[in-house]
Amino acid sequence: MTEFKQRQTVGNASESVLEFDGQQYLDGRASDPREFGWMRGAPPPPDKRVTFENETVWTFPQLRWSLSHMRELRPTVQVWRGRGGPSQLECSNRSTEIDGLTFVDMDDRTNRFEEALFDTYTDGILVLHRGRIIYERYFGALAPHVQHSCQSITKSYAGTLAAALVHEGILDDRKTISQFVPELRGTGWEDATLRQVMDMQTNVAFTEDYTSVDKSYRCEYLRTIRKEGAHGKFVYKGVDTNVMAWVMSRATGRSFAQLLQERLWLPLGCEEDAYVEIDPGNGMPRAHSGLNVTLRDLARFGELMRCEGSCNGKQ
């Protein structure tokens, strides 16, 4: 259980820390990436560099900078918003009311909503109510025009695209994966149906491991994964999403980024471009975790879900 300790001294400054599992971490205010000056300078001094080479991208507190700067760290491809104006998000500001809300946390302490945002290292938050923005705040490295890593929310975008292609008859979810992608014959997906992949009901020899190097989006790696047993039981795994994206691209002749652009970014009237992290070797997307998007454009996608696929008067 997390324990919050007030005004402990960290380094030469008096700052607040959070304690978790016996370790202390700078809190949301003290870990603000703007205060650390990550990647500033020409070139940045060694102790301010955030790179995969020095293994600081996923290290706290550098992580609070890297999640809003992934295209400076990895190869990416653009998701273009088009030349038209963005769709309007009406505002009905209730920030003062929401910031003042209080609740009792797991440690029986009364806490204000605004303080909880700092305690949970929030980079940005936007609340839509019936299509109107009632609350919007940004912290640290994030700003309204800056894209933030979506991580596994990317899977929701990929699944939405796949469901639309099935609905339109472009994809037949009863077919096996090897019928779409012959390169996956002899793998764990050879006899899995597209529907089983879409529902993460494959039984392949893969375990989600967030402590090792992620290879789950690489075609060469996917071809090494074998079957462990009968398909049909749900097990969460990102490799299924990457196989699904491979199927979509093979069937449509469009990349994952192009499908996002044509079927979501343009129709939704998104405000900013997005970008997708890709395999530097062959350009294949990290469809399980590689989308980076602004908070308002993420809200537009959420509103599309709330309205059951209806947007700007179109289904």
Question: Model segments located where?
Answer:
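Aromatic-acidic/polar surface patches that form glycan- and anion
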Residues: 117-120, 124, 149-152, 233-237, ...
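Penicillin-binding protein/beta-lactamase superfamily catalytic region
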Residues: 223-228, 233-234, 258, 273-315
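Active-site-proximal loop and beta-strand segments within enzyme catalytic domains
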Residues: 104-105, 109-117, 132, 143-150, ...
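A structural signal for well-ordered alpha-helical scaffolds and beta->alpha junctions
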Residues: 110, 190-191, 215, 240-241, ...
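N-terminal leader/targeting segments and the immediately adjacent pre-domain N-terminus
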Residues: 1-142, 168-171
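A small/polar active-site loop signature that marks catalytic segments
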Residues: 202-278
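Active-site helix/loop module of the DD-peptidase/beta-lactamase fold
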Residues: 149, 167-202, 252-289, 293
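Alpha-helical scaffold elements that line and support the substrate/ligand-binding pocket
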Residues: 131-134, 151-170, 197, 234-265, ...
